[in-house]
């Protein structure tokens, strides 16, 4: 007598597919807790390996904040002709403000310049003997953030020097160039270290799963004997790699925030010595979630290579 098989509706098959995935995912998580010591050792190494590049990322993010404040303070000073009328100077200020490369312009008159020089120089009494004010009026120009780099600032300086009434424009380009060079070196160094550490994560997860596969060799042979598909055999190990990455990423996020909190007092004290209100910035929710997703991706990649390499070599005898 023929056996009649009822074909399941597509929606039910779709739901069962994901239920099966969820079951194997949580089963893989349970496998970690069934070997607590080995799992904790692996997760600790993964957490530290992911925490180091994330700490470097936080360092770079804070360095870029400091760089931005330093670049903003590196303004272009335009020394104008002494005989230039006040109205002409104000017209020039408004004209320069219309430049797309300019963020703000501040005007300092000759009297204001002399008063400031008197306060900071310590030659107040000597200045009283001068017949006339030797200082010119000054326009202080802050470039737009997109132009706060050596090339952009130099181009803007040349443009401003062509303004009628400008005797000389000054900008410390050498200082800007050095600052940009230091930041580029920091970015390249951190990128190189991060690549090495993330490669270590791949090796750690891959080697851990290789040992798991060898420990479960007999079970894999039985599954192959009864006709289990490769996808069914691979799936628990793939989920194990993902769990390693996710939990390692969460641990790395926590370690990074601990480092930020631990360093906060020292950084605030240093900023106070320079009369700065700078405050250390942590990872934040977006960076933390990205770190967890990165850990999951690295775990999946490492487990995929390890599973396809080692399970393929296991055949029932």
Swiss-Prot record:
Residue intervals on the Cytoplasmic side: 1-39, 210-241, 302-317
Record-annotated membrane-spanning stretches: 40-60, 189-209, 242-262, 281-301
UniProt xrefs under Gene3D superfamilies: 3.30.70.3040
One annotated Gene Ontology cellular component of this protein: cell division site
Superkingdom of this protein's organism: Bacteria
GO biological process, any: cell division
Subcellular location: Cell inner membrane
Pfam family, any one: FtsX
Presence of keyword Membrane: yes
Regions of this protein lying in the Periplasmic compartment: 61-188, 263-280
Bilayer topology term: Multi-pass membrane protein
UniProt keywords, alphabetically: Cell cycle, Cell division, Cell inner membrane, Cell membrane, Membrane, Transmembrane, Transmembrane helix
Keyword Membrane belongs to the record: yes
Quaternary structure and partners: Forms a membrane-associated complex with FtsE.
Function: Part of the ABC transporter FtsEX involved in cellular division. Encoded in an operon consisting of genes ftsY, ftsE and ftsX.
Entry's family note: Belongs to the ABC-4 integral membrane protein family. FtsX subfamily.
Name this protein carries in UniProt: Cell division protein FtsX
Organismal lineage: Bacteria, Pseudomonadati, Pseudomonadota, Gammaproteobacteria, Aeromonadales
Gene assigned in the entry: ftsX
